Amino acid sequence: MEEKISQAIDDPNVFCFQELWIECQEVQKSQPIDSAVLRTLEIFCRGDIRDASSEWNELRFKKLRLLTLIDLANRHVGSSVSFETILVHLQLDRLPPSDPTFTVEYYIMQAMMNQILVGKINAKTQTLHVSWALERFLDSKRIDEMKYSLDRFIERCSNILFQLDAGTPSVSKSFKRASRMSSSDGIDYMVFDKRPRPDDTDFDL
């Protein structure tokens, strides 16, 4: 079991460890699992970069930073998070001096290319607008958080529709400005969404 855990952690394409964690809980009822290996799995399952071990290799550090990023992104779905906030949460400010913007963008792009994050980079405001992020561990607490976020989103949409029906000038102006915005404003710089769609069709050429 220890080998299976290590292989999953070191697999560059694996970012969700909940099923493996649950499997380990069942296996432990009949045979012990090395506590250090199990603790490492728990960190990759629901921990963040603050839990990293100094004994790990660089690849494990990078993966845990990506997982930390999507945790942060999940708290900002439908809104934006600053590069500065990402820099601190991923502890990138503790790395040797380099261009912080480049470093933050590197992790964002890695998350997007691995299809665990969908969003837009605004180069002008140095922010990431989050559309979607992978859920790492779904328990009752996380489900309650998601319900709360969904309720807030529905409330915001209802308020916008109410203002539109009322013909609120400020909303009309915002929509007019939005229609004039283009990629030159930095809004549509870097958009990745490779998730499969139910209506996707393969064509043989």
Swiss-Prot record:
The modification Phosphoserine is found at residue 183. The keyword Phosphoprotein applies. Signal peptide: none annotated. GO terms for biological process: protein deneddylation. It holds the Pfam family PCI. One of its GO terms (cellular component) is nucleus. Residues 1-135 form the PCI domain. Transmembrane segments: none annotated. Keywords: Phosphoprotein, Signalosome. InterPro entries: COPS7/eIF3m, PCI_dom. Component of the COP9 signalosome (CSN) complex. Belongs to the CSN7/EIF3M family. CSN7 subfamily. Component of the COP9 signalosome (CSN) complex that acts as an regulator of the ubiquitin (Ubl) conjugation pathway by mediating the deneddylation of the cullin subunit of SCF-type E3 ubiquitin-protein ligase complexes. This is COP9 signalosome complex subunit 7. It comes from Schizosaccharomyces pombe (strain 972 / ATCC 24843).
